[in-house]
Amino acid sequence: MMLKKALVCGAGGFIGSHLVSRLKRYGYWVRGADLKYPEFSKTTADDFRILDFRELSNCEKALEIGSGEKFDEVFQLAADMGGMGFIHSAECEIMRNSALTNINMIHASSKNDVSRYFFSSSACVYRDMNPEESELNEDDAYPAQPDNEYGWEKLYAERIAMAYGRRFNIPIRIARFQNCYGPEGTWEGGREKAPAAICRKVAEASNGGTIDVWGDGTAMRAFTYIDDMLDGIIMLVHSDLENGVNIGRQEYVSVDELVKIVIEVAGKNIQIKHIEGPVGVKARNFTNERIKNLGWESKISLKEGLSRTYSWIKSQVEKKSS
């Protein structure tokens, strides 16, 4: 029996590296490709290529495989991205680098007869909303009103993937991720997202100390643990769901509540100091009915996921300071 072959673009990143491991567990032959190897663990990919997807020729190299063979599934997760601070400070870089990557990869895939193509989009394609509003469904991405350029680029990339899918008869599967977190994600340097940044600050703070939090702490968010997100990706790819599909845990908390959960799992007594900084939208709540109809559900509570993530980040902080 021939093994299914998968190409994971962005396999050096957080979700991509975890996805490689999950696909290997399912018996795939996996090639990973990215600008860098995974930072915290050795890749489990059968083959790994260091490639810059802003060049079309590199996308073609990623798709090179034996004569008469092709990739059954291409997972496009490569992107120039980070937390809210990075998104607001690097708009041009995000739009240029990610747009080139997405244009080139879907174009190369269309020329290489791939059987199925997955694109990782984001809840950032949706507009700002008030916490008391009804949850957004997938159709509410239009009329388009993303609040930042990262969201606009994601929406454009969705459309170009779907256009190529129609022209070349490629099944396209698109996930709109809610915030994803977990061990082995970026936790320092400016590109880390809120859960990792907060875990780092709490780990570094002395008991009885204070940590800085951007904004007034009232912005509402939902966060999805990496294992749950991977379940959703696999289910979506093997389904017949077209267009963007929301994947995310519907456990909404304010930023201050998020901080307090991390402080609790750390077993510390720490005060919050609000400071000026980019905070993004007030809220972005969406419905998960389409992915839930496939049998998906989030199994890891926010507290449990943050406990696992905090333990890992604490070990990284201790390792760096030793």
Residue ranges and their predicted role:
Residues 103-147:
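Conserved Rossmann-fold NAD(P)-dependent oxidoreductase catalytic core, especially the SDR/UDP-sugar
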Residues 126-127, 149, 173-194, 220:
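Flexible, glycine-rich beta-alpha linker
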Residues 204-322:
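C-terminal substrate-binding subdomain of Rossmann-fold SDR/epimerase-dehydratase oxidoreductases
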